[in-house]
UniProtKB/Swiss-Prot annotation:
Taxonomic source organism: Homo sapiens
Subcellular location field: Secreted
Molecular function per GO: ubiquitin-protein transferase activity; zinc ion binding
Associated clinical condition: Spondyloepimetaphyseal dysplasia, Faden-Alkuraya type: An autosomal recessive skeletal disorder characterized by spondyloepimetaphyseal dysplasia, short stature, facial dysmorphism, short fourth metatarsals, and intellectual disability.
Glycosylation sites noted in the Swiss-Prot or TrEMBL record: 314
GO CC terms, sorted: cytoplasm; extracellular region
Signal peptide: 1-16
Cysteine pairs bridged by disulfides in the record: none
Protein name, entry field: RING finger and SPRY domain-containing protein 1
Lineage: superkingdom: Eukaryota
Amino acid sequence: MIVFGWAVFLASRSLGQGLLLTLEEHIAHFLGTGGAATTMGNSCICRDDSGTDDSVDTQQQQAENSAVPTADTRSQPRDPVRPPRRGRGPHEPRRKKQNVDGLVLDTLAVIRTLVDNDQEPPYSMITLHEMAETDEGWLDVVQSLIRVIPLEDPLGPAVITLLLDECPLPTKDALQKLTEILNLNGEVACQDSSHPAKHRNTSAVLGCLAEKLAGPASIGLLSPGILEYLLQCLKLQSHPTVMLFALIALEKFAQTSENKLTISESSISDRLVTLESWANDPDYLKRQVGFCAQWSLDNLFLKEGRQLTYEKVNLSSIRAMLNSNDVSEYLKISPHGLEARCDASSFESVRCTFCVDAGVWYYEVTVVTSGVMQIGWATRDSKFLNHEGYGIGDDEYSCAYDGCRQLIWYNARSKPHIHPCWKEGDTVGFLLDLNEKQMIFFLNGNQLPPEKQVFSSTVSGFFAAASFMSYQQCEFNFGAKPFKYPPSMKFSTFNDYAFLTAEEKIILPRHRRLALLKQVSIRENCCSLCCDEVADTQLKPCGHSDLCMDCALQLETCPLCRKEIVSRIRQISHIS
C-alpha cells in the first residue's frame, strides 16, 4: 500500500506543478520581468534554513539555460516531456550532504506511519524524489543511503528499495559516475569490517539497481570489480547481514541471463553450499543467509552433482503447507512449504493449501525478520495485487495482523493494537472461531480483543495467508509440530484434517517448473487466460471471444481492449 499511494501522489503532484509553472511563465511574460515572477514564486513556498529549501528562480533558469547551452547534463532533468519541478537550479549552490542525510533519516523515521493509500508522503520523501531528478542529485541520494542507513533498523534496506524504486531511472552517465565513486573491488569489501552497515547498504543499492535495470544496463553495472566485491562479501569472515544482501544482489543481477552465466562461472555455488547449512541456524540472521543460499542453489546457481532440496526433503509429516500455485510471482517458498521470504520490491502474498468452513482453527508463525508483514486469514476472493501494494487485510475478504507497525488490517484500513513491535524469534498465534464469528491474534501467548469485521462480507472459506514487504521472512506451523503458545480453548489444526498427495507437496524450483510448462501442449481453441478450458464465451459489447466462461465471470473489463464487460454469452457447449 505504501508504494502504490506514493506513486499516485507523485503522478498527481507532477501534473499540478507542471500547470503551476506554465501559469508562472505566462505571468512573467505579461509583467515583462523575470524578477517579479521570481518573487511571487518564492514567496509561496515556505522552507526552513536547513539547506533543503527550493529557492529556485524558474524563469531565470529557463533564460540562462536557453542563453548558455552546456554539455554537462548532470544537473538537467532527465525527462524532457515531464515539466520540471521546483528544484535546485544549475547555478544554485550545491545542497550540503548532511541535509541529504537528514532527509534520508527522516524518511526512515516516519516510514512506519505510512499506512494509507490516501496519505500524503512525508516532505522528506518528496524532496528526495525531486533531488533525484538530476544526475547529481540522484548520486547524492544514493551515496547518502549507503552512508547513513543504520544496521540495526529492520526497515533500513526496505527504505533503500522504496526510495530508489520510486526515483527516476538513472542515466548511463549517472551509473558510470556511481561506479567510479564507489570504486568497488575485493579489497574494498575487506575494509571497515567492523562497520558492516556501509557494505550492507552498498549491496542493497546494487541489488535494487540490478532489479530495476534488468537487461543491458544491468550487464554494464556488473563490472569485474563489483562482482569481485560481492563475492568477497560472501566469505565467512563477513558480517551475516553483509553476506545476506550481497547474495540478494547477486540473485538480482542473475535475472539477466548474461550476468547469470558470468556469476555462475565464478564458482559461487561452492560458497553457497557452505552457507546452505545455516538454513536452520538458531541465529535468525544466519538463518536468512541459509534460506537464500539454498534457494539460489535450487533455482539459479546450480551445482553439478548436488541433489535439489525438494528431492531429498522429508514431507511425510506435513499435510498442509503454503500453496505454490496460489502465490504472487516473486515470493520464495522453502522446499518443505512452511517458510516464505520476499526479496522483491513488490508486496508478495500467499495462501495456505487448506480451507476451513466451520469450527475453531489455530496456527502459529515464527517471526524471522521484524519488518512489515501482514499475516492472518483470507478467502479465495481476496486479491493479490503485489505491484499495487495490496495484500492480506487490504480488502473485505481478509484480515491481518501487522506486528511491525502495530496494526490490524481489514479492507485496506488499519487500526492500532496494544502489542509491542514484534522482533526476531517472536511467535504470533492466529485463532479463527467460525462458531462465534471472530478472529483472535496472539503475540507470544498474549491475546488481543476479537476481530469481527470480516464476517460482514464472508463467513466461510478461510485460508491462512500472509503478505511480505521487501526482505521479510517467517515460518508457519500448521500443526506438524507442537505449538509454542496453544490457546486455552479447544481448537483444530490444519495438519490434523488436511491431506496432500505426494505430488501436491512438491514445490518445484523455477527452472524445473518452466521445463514442464514447455512440454505442455495448448489447444488452438483454449481459453487465453487459463489455457485449460475451451474459449466458448463472447464478451459484450466489445465482441472478443477467446475466454472460457469461468475466466470471463472473474473479469470486469476485457483483457484485450479494456472495455467494460456488460454481458457474457456462451457461444458453444462445453467440450471436455
